[in-house]
């Protein structure tokens, strides 16, 4: 299978019961069937003074249109929530998240095991500069619906599931700051509404792989300055296939099967910096097979479509200055602010980091350096370096251990089960024949559910 196909699969596999103040929620009439965000008027800020509200303030909420609870199994209800967040230049903007409600009731797993208090924020690696690839819409499409088995798994465990469109309204793929802000504010928005979640005792965990890990890691490092109110509520984050340095990823994928990540990533990060975007466009060639039109076409492509369109293409052939574009000071304005992890804060909650040492998209040396940086200042990290597997394969190989780690944290048993303080770095060999889950000291019902994954 071509790598871009595997990346596409990677990006895909993955009752309103609480009272709230109607005056805080602004609704707009929408079709009962889902529309792409670019065509749906619901995906817009309200015509009021929303910019002066606090980050995480809910601006609109609606039951998810169409048949989303049929597409996603084990969900009793689903809601779209539009909320105020902050872009990469620390200006007010908005984003959308989708909240899936598990099966509730006194005999449900959500009630028995978690007291309806466990919220998993899963950041989908949608890896696209097209706003219509956002999970709140793509989950309905043939491409996206085939990947909701991971949603089903989380919901079957009794977890409330938060799935943010963390790239924001400009589809700012690879822009770390807005991705982190939008992730944190989606959690704030959900906690402010409840929607069946026991918010007085809520535990929240984050999970993401590849592009989803980008959002989850940035949320974790930004929280200390941007969302200190969440530090006692968030119990941990599982991040795999981490991309600490956007430039390194662009250089790795150029000319390879996954080259489509390049145009989408550059278009995405520069969407947060209009002057940088303007300069970038001026540096694109205007003729030949790799020209401006071809490059900018990525703005309307999903990760799978971009993977097919740019497979094997040398990314730097589009630019007048070739690979030096990544070292151009005018481009570095965006990359240095928004594309390099580890310089905005230190995660204050436990981290489970995992990556293949053979990762062909994000060199593991950069992840090693990031972890070492955090370890030097007291972060609590379990880091597993898998000796086998490619970037997409590692997503599949380590999904079950990640779920185990997350569910243990959400039951409040992280310290008891994992017994790690500070940094623990392990070299592991996790392949398709390895036992994916090992029973530890946790709720039997959760382990029984894990065994069915």
Description of each model-found segment:
Residues 115-119, 156-162, 201-203, 231-236, ...:
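Loop/turn elements at helix/coil->beta-strand transitions in domains of secreted/extracellular proteins
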Residues 347, 352-359:
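Short beta-strand/loop motif that positions the catalytic acidic residue
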Residues 14-107, 453:
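Catalytic-loop region of hydrolases
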Residues 146-150, 173-196, 220-221:
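Alpha/beta-hydrolase active-site loop
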Residues 332-335, 361, 368-453:
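C-terminal catalytic histidine-bearing segment of alpha/beta-hydrolase fold enzymes
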Residues 33-34, 44-48, 240-344:
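Accessory cap/linker subdomain of secreted extracellular hydrolases
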Residues 87-154, 165-167:
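Short, surface-exposed "cap/lid" segments of acyl-processing enzymes
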Residues 188-261:
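Primarily recognizes the serine-hydrolase "nucleophile elbow" in alpha/beta-hydrolase
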């Amino acid at each position: 299978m071509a790598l871009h196909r595997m990346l596409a699969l990677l990006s895909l596999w993955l009752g309103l019961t609480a009272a709230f103040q109607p005056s805080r929620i602004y609704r707009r009439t929408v079709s009962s069937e889902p529309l792409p965000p670019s065509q749906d008027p619901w995906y817009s800020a309200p015509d009021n003074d929303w910019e002066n509200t606090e980050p995480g303030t809910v601006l609109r909420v609606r039951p998810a249109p169409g048949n989303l609870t049929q597409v996603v199994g084990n969900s009793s209800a689903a809601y779209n929530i539009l909320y105020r967040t902050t872009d990469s230049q620390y200006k007010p903007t908005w984003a959308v998240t989708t909240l899936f409600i598990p099966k509730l009731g006194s005999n449900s797993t959500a009630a028995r095991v978690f007291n309806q208090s466990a919220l998993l924020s899963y950041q989908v690696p949608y890896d696209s500069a097209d706003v219509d690839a956002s999970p709140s819409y793509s989950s309905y499409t043939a491409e996206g619906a085939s990947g909701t088995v991971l949603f089903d798994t989380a919901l079957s465990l009794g977890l409330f599931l938060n799935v943010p469109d963390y790239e924001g309204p400009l589809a700012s793929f690879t822009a770390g700051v807005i991705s982190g802000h939008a992730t944190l504010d989606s959690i704030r928005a959900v906690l402010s509404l409840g929607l069946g979640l026991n918010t007085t005792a809520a535990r929240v965990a984050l999970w993401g792989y590849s592009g989803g890990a980008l959002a989850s890691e940035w949320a974790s490092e930004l929280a200390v300055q941007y969302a200190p109110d969440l530090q006692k509520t968030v119990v941990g984050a599982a991040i795999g296939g981490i991309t600490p340095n956007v430039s390194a990823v662009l250089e790795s994928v150029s000319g390879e099967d996954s080259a489509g990540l390049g145009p989408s990533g550059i278009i995405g990060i520069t969407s947060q910096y209009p002057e940088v975007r303007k300069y970038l466009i001026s540096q694109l060639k205007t003729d030949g097979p790799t020209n401006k039109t071809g490059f900018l076409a990525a703005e309307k492509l999903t990760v799978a479509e971009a993977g097919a369109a740019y497979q094997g293409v040398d990314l730097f052939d589009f630019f007048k200055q070739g690979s030096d574009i990544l070292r151009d000071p005018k481009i570095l304005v965006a990359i240095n602010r928004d594309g390099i992890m580890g310089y905005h804060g230190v995660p204050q909650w436990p981290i489970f980091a995992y990556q293949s040492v053979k990762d062909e998209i994000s060199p593991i040396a950069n992840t090693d350096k990031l972890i070492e940086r955090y370890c030097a200042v007291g972060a609590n990290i379990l880091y597993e370096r898998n000796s086998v597997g490619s970037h997409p394969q590692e997503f599949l190989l380590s999904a079950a251990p990640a779920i185990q780690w997350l569910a243990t944290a959400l039951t409040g048993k992280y310290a008891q089960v994992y017994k790690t303080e500070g940094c623990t770095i392990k070299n592991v060999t996790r392949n398709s024949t390895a036992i994916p889950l090992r029973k530890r000291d946790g709720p039997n019902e959760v382990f029984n559910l894990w065994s069915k994954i």
